[in-house]
A protein has these predicted regions:
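Acidic helix-start/capping segments at beta-turn-to-alpha-helix junctions
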Residues: 52-57
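Short, well-ordered amphipathic alpha-helical segments that serve as non-catalytic structural scaffolds
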Residues: 28-43, 69
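A short alpha-helix capping/helix-coil boundary motif
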Residues: 13-15, 49, 78-80
Length: 150
């Protein structure tokens, strides 16, 4: 008999941060707000989250298109995960959902936090908008080593 993994999974919680065109919080802080809301809405605790997924992963180019990745959010929430996926290899925004379904079906994890961060409007209002890092400015986060190659 054919087994359909998507029928054995469910979206149990949803969270959303404040939305603005000039955010007073960082992209990571907004993502943390939404993640905590989703975890609470699902009736879970941070300790019960054992997977994390996003698309397309963290981009350190200053555009705000995808400013937060799995590693940054995992660290901010102090999550201990067995599985994560946060790359642009998936076929679009729903790629993170399908990756999570596969991970749950494979028994790699049970409760996956899926998120998508966008900060484009705020990024356009900053000195970083649509530019590479200027001399003297520091890049932070897990992709700091890649900044010279963007």
């Amino acid at each position: 008999m054919t087994r359909h993994a998507e029928k054995d999974t469910a979206i149990t919680g949803i969270g959303m941060s404040d939305v603005s065109r000039g955010a007073s919080k960082s992209a990571l802080a907004l993502t943390v707000d939404a993640a905590l809301e989703a975890i609470a809405d699902a009736g879970l605790t941070r300790a019960e989250i054992d997977g994390i997924a996003t698309w397309p992963g963290e981009r350190a180019d200053g555009s705000g298109f995808s400013p937060v990745g799995c590693a940054s959010l995992q660290d901010a929430l102090r999550l201990k995960v067995n599985w994560y996926a946060g790359g642009g290899e998936a076929p679009g925004q729903y790629g993170a959902v399908f990756n999570a379904i596969g991970a749950i079906a494979a028994g790699l994890c049970r409760n996956v936090l899926i998120f998508r961060s966008m900060y484009e409007a705020t990024a356009r209002k900053t000195a970083f908008a649509n530019s590479l890092l200027r001399p003297g400015e520091r890049q932070a986060g897990p992709f700091a080593w890649y900044a010279p190659y963007y």
